[in-house]
Amino acid sequence: LLKEFNFSTNIFNWEEFKLFDQYFERILVSKGTFLIKEGETERYSYFVFEGILRCWLLNYNGEEQTFWFCKEGTFSMSNISFTLQTRSAFNVQTIVDSVIYRIDKKQVNELYTAIPKVKTVFEDLNAILLNKLLKRNIDLIKYSPE
């Protein structure tokens, strides 16, 4: 995960890495499973270990419109709903059988207490993700055929 976002793996020592892993639950998720549906509030933060997720919604014509893919080594976009504890504006669904690690709010708070620098790292990861989303939106406008 840290390599995906160009973070140094030296941020945590070996003991912290082992402790970090204990807070996440490994789950196997079948193809086509919804991790969250539009209108629900996310109860977990998901990390994609193997597989791929798609983020989509119904457009004004009632057609499915995919706007983002969460690949291996990234967190699910449903983290927006999870972090803010607001209703999700979109669906997140597996498109292949996947191995996902998840953590709930209570475990996140315990993790932040056990390893305080994790909170800063997660905040930085969220900022990097937001920057990627903004860049994508700007590119769609900038390079539009209009």
Model-derived features with residue positions:
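Cyclic nucleotide-binding regulatory domains
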Residues: S8, T33-I95
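A generic structural signal for ordered secondary structure
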Residues: F24, I52, E64, I100-I103, ...
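Short acidic/polar alpha-helix capping motifs at helix-coil junctions
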Residues: E15-F20, L53-W56, K71-T74, A114-P116, ...
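Hydrophobic residues at beta-strand termini and immediately following loops
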Residues: I27-V29, C70, I103
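Polybasic "coupling" helices that flank or enter modular domains
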Residues: Q93-V96, Y101-E146
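Short N-terminal signal/transit or membrane-insertion segments
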Residues: L19-T41, Y143
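Cyclic nucleotide-binding regulatory module and flanking cytosolic helices
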Residues: L1-L28, S81
